[in-house]
């Protein structure tokens, strides 16, 4: 033991918090952090001789008041071998715990703090052993141990407490706790009456040694009486067959309830309408009427809560990675038929332009003659006639004639498909409905034949292939504006139809 550092003796089996051995190592250096401030505060709260310095606040669960701040600071400085310790420094250390969510300051009350037992502070140290020595108010935290059993009254209308708000106490419990602070024996008497009176039914089927341990050893003397709404958590046995599960199979047969999947009190998913505590967490949604721990269950339980405290910074809805943990289903599950209505339904693609042309052409192919459709060649880019010599123009005209004659034997469906792929446009209406005329592609070819008879004149027939595809009226207008010789030919009655006028037109149509 270091000189000048009087370390508080390790409590014997009689009472107080028993922290792990490393918290009391005498060889630890002065100022070491082997014991934390909140450990020390809990230690002082459990000791009867420091009741005038720091004590639990009556009526509030986990709340304590520092009656003599300077004395508490002096005791803490002596424990940590820091004689210059004062309450300002100690309060800064307490504010550090605000962020850690271990405790918080009670608003409106001086020197009053409250432990956040919903963060399960104590299971940080799973082997803490509690034995009450003396009078402890009801706000003192109950802590389960592996050597004790805890039993809770059932949910019925004749419960000794009437307050349904968790974490609070009814008037009767507050007056009882006030009497307990003056006389320690009244507490045990009242508890024994509670054992005999209101807990007759939930003691059935439970180890008879548990009640003796609870009363004789004062095991439930420090325990807060739960409100009516508090119920056991683990409802169905055999829920965790996995040996790695944090919970063992309960030896007591469970009863079905609204929420049948057990949830660990170390998880924040458990509804917050009741107060959390490091004692066995109880769910208000199960209707079992008895609850007990065996040592193996308690070992798993404390381990799981310790893991929860170590992971306190995680999201409130995150789960520790337990292999056997079963997550309860959501309450607002959608029906299968409702969930399927949002699925994406793939529809067949719409009929393309090519397929539409094919369907329309099959319907219109009857009144249209095959040579008329066959006379429309593929759209090919042709250089203007002004850039070519007359010899090349004659050769191109012959090739076009042969090409149109060969295409005349091709079935109409194939030509219509070819036409659809190249350019889809409605057919031009004929100028003279009563007289069948040849298609535009034949007209420039006849002009080229006429141009062969007159080699001195530059032919205008094979200008561009686009001219062969344009309507006859537009082509006539263009030639009328561009070619002065065409005007003279039209005046003399020899325009485009080999100088035969309407008679030549009818003859050409008959030949076609």
UniProtKB/Swiss-Prot annotation:
Cross-link position per record: Glycyl lysine isopeptide (Lys-Gly) (interchain with G-Cter in SUMO2): 381, 388
Acetylation listed as a keyword: yes
Disulfide bond entries: none
Cell compartments where the protein resides: Nucleus
Coiled-coil annotated spans: none
Keyword field contains ATP-binding: no
Residues within the DNA-binding region(s): 35-116
Segments for region (Disordered): 136-222, 336-512
Biased composition (Basic and acidic residues): 380-406, 453-468, 479-491
Residue(s) carrying Phosphoserine: 139, 159, 315
Principal cellular location given in the protein's record: nucleus
Polar residues compositional bias, start-end: 158-184
Keyword tags: Acetylation, DNA-binding, Isopeptide bond, Nucleus, Phosphoprotein, Repressor, Transcription, Transcription regulation, Ubl conjugation
Single annotated GO MF: DEAD/H-box RNA helicase binding
Function per UniProt: Transcriptional repressor that contribute to growth arrest during terminal macrophage differentiation by repressing target genes involved in Ras-dependent proliferation. Represses MMP1 promoter activity.
Family: Belongs to the ETS family.
Name under which the protein is recorded: ETS translocation variant 3
Organism per entry: Gorilla gorilla gorilla
Lineage: Eukaryota, Metazoa, Chordata, Craniata, Vertebrata
Gene from which the chain derives: ETV3
């Amino acid at each position: 033991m270091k000189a000048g550092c009087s370390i508080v003796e390790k409590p014997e089996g009689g009472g107080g918090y028993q922290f792990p051995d490393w918290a009391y190592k005498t060889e630890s250096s002065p100022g070491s952090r082997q014991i934390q401030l909140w450990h020390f505060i809990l230690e002082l709260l459990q000791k009867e001789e420091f009741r005038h310095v720091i004590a639990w606040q009556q009526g509030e669960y986990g709340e304590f008041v520092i009656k003599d701040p300077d004395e508490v600071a002096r005791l803490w400085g002596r424990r940590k071998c820091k004689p210059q310790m004062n309450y300002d420094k100690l309060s800064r250390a307490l504010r550090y715990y605000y962020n850690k969510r271990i405790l918080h300051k009670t608003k409106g009350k001086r020197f009053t703090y409250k432990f956040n037992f919903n963060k399960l502070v104590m299971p940080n140290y799973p082997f803490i052993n509690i034995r009450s020595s003396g009078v402890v108010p009801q706000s003192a935290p109950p802590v389960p141990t592996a050597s004790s059993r805890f039993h809770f009254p059932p949910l019925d209308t004749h419960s000794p407490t009437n307050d349904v708000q968790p974490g609070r106490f009814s008037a009767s419990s507050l007056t009882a706790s006030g009497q307990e602070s003056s006389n320690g024996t009244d507490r045990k008497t009242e508890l024994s009456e509670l054992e005999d009176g209101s807990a007759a039914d939930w003691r059935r089927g439970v180890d008879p040694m548990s009640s003796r341990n609870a009363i004789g050893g004062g095991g439930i003397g420090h325990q807060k009486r739960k409100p009516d709404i508090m119920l056991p958590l683990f409802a169905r046995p055999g829920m965790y067959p996995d040996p790695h599960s944090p919970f063992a199979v309960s030896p007591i047969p469970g009863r079905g309830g609204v929420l049948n999947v057990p949830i660990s009190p170390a998880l924040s998913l458990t509804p917050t309408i009741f107060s959390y505590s490091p004692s066995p967490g109880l769910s208000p949604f199960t209707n079992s009427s008895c609850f007990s721990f065996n040592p193996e269950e308690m070992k798993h339980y404390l381990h799981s809560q310790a893991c929860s405290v170590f992971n306190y910074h995680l999201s409130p809805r995150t789960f520790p990675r337990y292999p056997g943990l079963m997550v309860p289903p959501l309450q607002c599950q959608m029906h299968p038929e409702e969930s399927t209505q949002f699925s994406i339904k793939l529809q067949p693609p719409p009929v393309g332009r090519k397929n539409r042309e094919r369907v329309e052409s099959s319907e219109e192919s009857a009144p249209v003659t095959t040579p008329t459709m066959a006379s429309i060649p593929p759209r090919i880019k042709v250089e203007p006639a002004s850039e070519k010599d007359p010899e090349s123009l004659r050769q191109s005209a012959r090739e076009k004639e042969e090409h149109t004659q060969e295409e005349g034997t091709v079935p109409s469906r194939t030509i219509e498909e070819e036409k659809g792929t190249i350019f889809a446009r409605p057919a031009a209406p004929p100028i003279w409905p009563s007289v069948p005329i040849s298609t535009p592609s034949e007209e420039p070819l006849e002009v080229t034949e006429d141009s062969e008879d007159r080699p001195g004149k530059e032919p205008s027939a094979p200008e561009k292939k686009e001219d062969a595809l344009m309507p006859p009226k537009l082509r006539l207008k263009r030639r009328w504006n561009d070619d002065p010789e065409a005007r003279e030919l039209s005046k003399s009655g020899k325009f485009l139809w080999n100088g035969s006028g309407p008679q030549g037109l009818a003859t050409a149509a008959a030949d076609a």
